């Protein structure tokens, strides 16, 4: 956050945040409301939600949804972390892909026909068409997402400028901590769910407010969220589904339903199920997203109705600082999308999916807290934060 503000000289900062389930196809550690508090305490001025229909998707769709929201909010610059760290290289790679589009598409098809996943086939195709050092490594996850952010900016004819900050010391999938007080999300999650987990172990790697809120959530609700806690629900659901039922679920393609129903029979944990399920053709992340759609019963028809090829249909406001509130007041007449401060009286196919996802997310919380959380989610007004006193209002 500090580097972003230094690089962009921004007046305010806006974060577009996933709801209960993430782009990797797994539940968020804590609720979006707690994560909103974390963001505000770390210097973000406006926190808005990326709907489930965009947030649990491949990088292209995820980026398209996020950029459409930022564009509607009249954001002038976007800043993202990447393994490359040079924004010119992203634009150059996009230019090369456009000029070599026919060759690129042929190579992707060729590598997929050889049994590779779409992600692997795309990465290999880029290796073949990119030769200059001024191109980015498209096998790296943050480079891929940044590439899609810029493509979305260009496709939406936005005047938004892009900046990138180089990630260092810790890579996206690193599972261990290093001695530079920088850790990946993967390593933090692994530590939190280890046998002798302790918040003390992760405190040097995250902001003080984040550590405090993580501990508070676990104390208040008795848990942090990960896939294993949903596995019994997930397995029960699959045991009651037919191949035909599964084929209606979003991202279940090419006979994957038969493999899923076969592997679930002997799996005793989500991790063992994923180990049995994964193949050269299907990446772990791709399969996790499919599993998320099974868990939330998100169908192909529902995603079709959400019209994800277009922009996000609304802006769900989760939190704001005083500066953020001032920005919205000054610009609300220019913002074309409806801004939702609660969802009790609003209806939309995309929001219907979000409500289901929230219900599933809180299913592991004990009653009566679970029902309270579900009711609050629809009526919850944006969290307000006074940045001068560092207190929530």
UniProtKB/Swiss-Prot annotation:
Its EC number is 6.3.4.-. InterPro entries: Rossmann-like_a/b/a_fold (IPR014729), tRNA(Met)_cyd_acetate_ligase (IPR008513). GO terms for biological process: tRNA modification. GO terms for cellular component: cytoplasm. ATP binds at residues 81, 142, 167. The keyword Signal does not apply. Keywords: ATP-binding, Cytoplasm, Ligase, Nucleotide-binding, RNA-binding, tRNA processing, tRNA-binding. It is found in: Cytoplasm. One of its GO terms (molecular function) is ligase activity, forming carbon-nitrogen bonds. It catalyses: cytidine(34) in elongator tRNA(Met) + acetate + ATP = N(4)-acetylcytidine(34) in elongator tRNA(Met) + AMP + diphosphate. Disulfide bonds: none annotated. It is an enzyme of class 6 (ligase). Its main location: cytoplasm. Catalyzes the formation of N(4)-acetylcytidine (ac(4)C) at the wobble position of elongator tRNA(Met), using acetate and ATP as substrates. First activates an acetate ion to form acetyladenylate (Ac-AMP) and then transfers the acetyl group to tRNA to form ac(4)C34. Belongs to the TmcAL family. This is tRNA(Met) cytidine acetate ligase. The gene is tmcAL.
């Amino acid at each position: 956050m500090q580097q972003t503000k230094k690089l962009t000289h921004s007046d305010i900062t806006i974060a577009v945040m996933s709801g209960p389930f993430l782009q990797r196809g797994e539940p968020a550690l804590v609720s979006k409301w707690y994560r909103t508090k974390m963001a505000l305490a770390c210097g973000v001025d406006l926190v808005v939600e990326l709907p489930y229909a965009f947030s649990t998707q491949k990088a292209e769709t995820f980026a398209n949804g996020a950029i459409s929201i930022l564009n509607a909010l009249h954001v002038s610059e976007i800043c993202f972390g990447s393994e490359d760290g040079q924004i010119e290289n992203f634009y150059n790679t996009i230019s090369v892909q456009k000029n070599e589009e026919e060759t690129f598409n042929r190579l992707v098809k060729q590598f997929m026909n050889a049994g590779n996943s779409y992600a692997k086939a795309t990465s290999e195709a880029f290796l073949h068409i990119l030769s200059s050092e001024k191109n980015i490594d498209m096998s790296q996850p943050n480079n891929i997402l940044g590439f899609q952010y810029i493509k979305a900016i260009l496709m939406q004819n936005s005047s938004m400028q892009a900046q990138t900050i180089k990630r260092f010391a810790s890579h996206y999938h690193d599972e261990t901590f290093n001695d530079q007080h920088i850790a990946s999300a993967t390593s933090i999650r692994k530590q939190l769910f280890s046998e002798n987990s302790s918040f003390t172990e992760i405190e040097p790697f995250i902001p003080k407010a984040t550590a405090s809120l993580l501990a508070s959530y676990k104390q208040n609700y008795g848990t942090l969220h990960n896939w294993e806690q949903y596995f019994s629900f997930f397995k029960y659901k699959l045991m009651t589904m037919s191949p035909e039922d599964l084929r209606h679920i979003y991202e279940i393609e090419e006979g994957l339903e038969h493999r899923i129903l076969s592997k679930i029979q002997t799996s005793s944990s989500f991790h063992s199920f994923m180990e049995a399920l994964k193949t050269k053709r299907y990446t772990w992340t791709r399969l996790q997203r499919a599993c998320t759609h099974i868990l939330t019963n998100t169908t192909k028809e529902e995603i079709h109705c959400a019209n994800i090829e277009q922009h996000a249909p609304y802006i769900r406001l989760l939190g704001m600082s005083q500066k953020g509130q001032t920005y919205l007041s000054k610009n609300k007449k220019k913002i074309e999308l409806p801004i939702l401060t609660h969802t009790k009286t609003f209806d939309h196919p995309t929001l219907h999916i979000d409500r289901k996802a929230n219900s599933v997310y809180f299913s592991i919380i004990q009653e009566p807290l679970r029902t309270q959380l579900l009711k609050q989610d629809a009526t919850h007004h944006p969290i307000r934060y006074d940045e001068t006193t560092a207190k929530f209002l």
